Amino acid sequence: MYSRRELEDLEYRYYSEMKDGTRKVKISESLFRCPFCYIDRKRDYQFDDLLRHASGIGGSSRTKDGRDKARHLALERYMRKYLRPRERPRPSPTSDVSSLPKEEFTGKWKSTLSTTEEGEFITTENSSSPHIVKAEPKFVSGDDSGRSGEERLKFSDKPDPFFSNEDKSYPAKRPCLVSGAKEGDEPVQRIGLSHGASFAPTYPQKLVSLGAGNGDQMYVHPWKGILANMKRTFNEKTRKYAGESGSKIREDLIKKGFNPHKVTPLWNGRLGFTGFAIVDFGKEWEGFRNATMFDKHFEVSQCGKRDHDLTRDPGDKLYGWVAKQDDYYSRTAIGDHLRKQGDLKSVSGKEAEDQRKTFTLVSNLENTLVTKSDNLQQMESIYKQTSSVLEKRMKEKDEMINTHNEKMSIMQQTARDYLASIYEEHEKASQHLEAQRKEYEDRENYLDKCQAKNKTERRKLQWQKHKNLMATQEQNKADEDMMRLAEQQQREKDELRKQVRELEEKIDAEQALELEIERMRGDLQVMGHMQEGEGEDSKIKEMIEKTKEELKEKEEDWEYQESLYQTLVVKHGYTNDELQDARKALIRSMRELTTRAYIGVKRMGALDETPFKKVAKEKYPAVEADKKAEELCSLWEEHLGDSAWHPIKVVEKDGIAKEELNEEDEKLQELRKELGEEVYAAVTQALKERNEYNGSGRYIVPELWNFKQNRKASIKEGVVYLVNSWKQKKPKPKRR
C-alpha cells in the first residue's frame, strides 16, 4: 500500500521516462500503444481509446495495485500534454502579428487567443506565465464566405487546460524557467511569432498546477485558512513563545459560524509559537463555503491578507485569509506546512475532478446494473427451467396417483370377488350338511318304521353309543386336566428356575411321573367303563390290575419326590433368609465405612443433587443458588415419595407385561421444560430405582453395589472386600 507522497513520486518518475523517450507511446501519426500493459503489448490504440484506457485505470477505485495506477495517471498526463494530434497551421490574414497593437507584447495579458486546428499558440489570461495551448478547430462561416471557401478564425476566451505548460502534481520537482534565454537558443518570442501568436513572453519563476492557466484562482486543497498575529506570551524559563491551543481557537471559530475541522498552531523549534495557525476546513464544498466566509469576515473587518501585508504595526488585531497559491509557495513555516498537507486546486479543477469521480461512479453503477440484469436473467431462466421440471414432476405424480388408485380399485374388486366366492362355498357346505341331516332323520324314521329285529341289538347299540360318548368325555376331561396341570407346572417351573437350578432334573422327573399317573388314571377309568359295557373280560381285568400296580408304584415315587422337594424348599428358604440377613448385616457394616471404594452401599432411589446445583447456578445469583438447589431437590423428593403420583405404565411386549416410564406425564414434561435434560434424567433414574426396589412404599432402599461395574454386588464380593480391607488395616506384629 503506497502513501500519497509515494504515488506522486512514482507518477512523476514514469512521466519523466516517457518524456525522455525511455518508454515509447507513439507508434505512428495515428497509432499509440500502452507501455505498461504487457498483456496487451501487441494491441494498438487510437489516441482517444488509449486516453480512455489510461484514465479508466488511473481514476478507478477498483485498481488495487498503486504502482499500476500511478503509471496510467502519468500516461494520461503525458498524452494530454504532448501527444494530442495536431496539423500544420494554415495561413490566415487575421493572424498577422504586425497588425496587433504593441501593448499586447508587454505586461500581463488580458485574453487568450485560439487559432484554427492547424496552429499551436502560447497564451495566458491574467498571468505573466505563458502557456502552450493546443487550439481546437473552430471555423466560422458567414453567409457568403463559407461558400467561397474562405475561412475565418474564431477566438476563444479560455485555453485548453490539458495542454497548459504548468503541472500541478510536482511543483517542487520541475525545473523553473529563467527570465533570459541561453546564448544561441532561439527566443521564445520568436517561436511564438513564427506560429502566428501575438505576445511578448515573460518567464515564470515556478510552474503552477493544472487549471491555473485558465484564469481561475488557485486555492490550497483541502481548503485551508491562515490566522496571523495571534497573541503569544514569552516564557522566561524556556526562552520561547507560547500561545493558545488549537482546540480553543477552533471553539472560538465555531462560535463565529466558520465550523473548521481542525486548527494547527505553527511552532518553531528555536522561538516556539510563531503567531500563525492553519485552519483546516476539509475537502468538501461545505468547507470551501466556510473558508470563503472566513476570508470575507476578515476582509470586511480590514484584517485580511492585504491589510496584514501593508500594515507595519498590526497591534493586537487578529488577521486571517484563505490559503492560496502565493501562501503555498512561500518560503516560511506556512508554506512548508501547506506543501506537506495539501496541494493547489482551482474551483473549476475541483469541479472537473468531482465530475470525473461522478462519471466513474456512474460507469461502475452501470456495470453493476448490467451484471445484476444478467444475473436476473439467469435466475429467470433457472426459475423457468425449475418450473417446467416441477410441472413435469407434478404430472408424473398425478399419473402415479391415478395408477395407484386404479390398482387399489382392482385389488378391492378382487377381494370382494374372493369373499363372494367364499360365501357361496359356505352356503353350498351348509346346504350339503342340511341335506345330510335330513337324510339321517329319514333313515331314523325308516328304522323306526321298520322296527329292529330284536330289542337286544337296539339296546346294545344305544349302550355302545353312550359308552363311547362317556369314554370320549372322560378322555377329553383327562386331557384338559393334563394340559391345565402342565401349564401350571410350566408356570411354577418358570418362577423357580432362577432360584433352584439344581432341582430342574428332579422336578422334570416328578412332572413326568405325575403326568403318567394322571394318564394311567384316565386309562383306568376308560377301561372301567369299557368293562361295564362288555361284561367280565379276563384280559381287560388283567390290564386293569397291572395298571393299578404301576399306578401305585408311580404314586409312591411321586410322594417320595414330593417330600424330598418340600424338604429342599424349606432348606432353600432357610438358606435364603440367612443370606438376606447376611446381606443386611454386610450393608450395615459397610455403611460405617467412609472411604470411597469400588464396593459399597448405594441408596437406591436417592436423588442426585448435582444437576439441581448446576441449574440453580445458571438461573439464580450465586448467593441464592445453593438455597434454590436445596428447595428444588426437596420438592422433587416429596414428589418421588408421593404414592398418589404414579408415572409408570404397564406395556405388554411379546405376551409379557412390563413396566415402563410414562414420558407423557405432565409433571415430567414440566420438569424437562423448566429445568432441562440433566435434572430430568436424575429424577427419572431415581423414580425407576424406587419402583424396582420398593414399588409399593417408594422409599429409598440401601443396596450392596459394585461402583466400578455399575451393578448390584454379590455377598461374596462384599465379604472379599471387607476381608481385604481388614488385612490392610490390621496392625503388623512388632519385631523383637
Curated annotation (Swiss-Prot):
- Extract the Pfam families matched here: XH, XS, zf-XS
Ranges of compositional bias, category Basic and acidic residues: 80-90, 144-167
Keywords (alphabetical) are: Coiled coil, Methyltransferase, RNA-mediated gene silencing, Transferase
Coiled-coil regions listed in the entry: 360-597
* Regions crossing the membrane: none
Q: What does this protein do?
A: Acts in association with FDM3 and FDM5 for RNA-directed DNA methylation (RdDM).
State the protein's name.
Factor of DNA methylation 4
